[in-house]
């Protein structure tokens, strides 16, 4: 996948004010589509633990998108907190972050990536499907509430 020009993607600390703002935007966007009792919002503090790596996309130094890889058990990685600001959507940034997450997962020897997204997020589905992910049943400890769509991708 080609990285959008003028966008740099790197692993960064989630404990930055600018990232807190971006995560708050993500949470608001999710709550507009899904009842709060069915949202699982990983906080920046949770992302700061050793099992999660946060990728941030910056355009002209400004954080415009993010996505995280959380290492689970048995060689499974979970894609978390994927978000692109509306003024940068449709430019391939989400797909580029997803490719970075997958590359890190492969380097770390993970054998499978999984994720949970909302049932009203067709733009997200397209990003995941273009990235080679396939729909599956519930993953990890997520319940099948009817508000979620699950994806997986074998890496090995």
Show the residue positions of the predicted features.
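Active-site acidic-Proline motif in GNAT/NAT acetyltransferases
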Residues: 85-87, 91, 119
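Charged, amphipathic alpha-helical coiled-coil/dimerization segments
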Residues: 91, 103, 112-114
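C-terminal "cap" of GNAT-fold acetyltransferases
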Residues: 2-4, 8, 14-15, 111-114, ...
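Acetyl-CoA-dependent GNAT
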Residues: 3-80, 85-87, 98-100, 104, ...
